[in-house]
């Protein structure tokens, strides 16, 4: 079963994401530091789904740190803020995909399926 790490500092969003991705094995983290610790404990991690704006570091900073250990880690980044999603410039170049929050469950599941395949 594919393993996904979901990172978001909003507990209601974290719960929504974990539920929506229930067909996969899901680990959750409430902040980037917890995500780094959780990722170290997972031997086979297929995807990270992470918020972009979080208190201790941004999503692209988290991704850079995770990719130091897992260079081929696939990423789906989420943002709930009024950010223009410019795929030509950072931070979006560090990810394989991005979605704006709020998103439909089908959009989330579709993006995940494209990145890592069906469970």
Where do the language-model regions lie?
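Acidic, metal-coordinating helix/loop segments flanking the phosphotransfer/catalytic sites
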Residues: 28-47, 68
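C-terminal output helix
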Residues: 103-114
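Two-component/phosphorelay signaling modules centered on CheY-like receiver
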Residues: 11-28
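Active-site T/S-Asp motif of two-component receiver
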Residues: 49-51
């Amino acid at each position: 079963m594919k393993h996904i790490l979901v990172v978001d500092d909003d507990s209601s969003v974290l719960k929504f994401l974990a539920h929506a991705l229930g067909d996969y094995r899901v680990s959750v983290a409430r902040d980037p530091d917890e995500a780094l610790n959780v990722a170290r404990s997972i031997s086979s991690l297929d995807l990270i789904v992470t918020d972009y704006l979080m208190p201790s570091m941004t999503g692209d900073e988290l991704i850079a740190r995770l990719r130091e250990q897992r260079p081929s880690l696939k990423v789906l980044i989420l943002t709930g803020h009024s950010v223009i999603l410019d795929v030509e410039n950072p931070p979006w170049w560090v990810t394989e995909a991005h979605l704006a929050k709020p998103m439909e469950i089908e959009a989330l599941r579709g993006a995940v399926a494209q990145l890592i395949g069906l469970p």
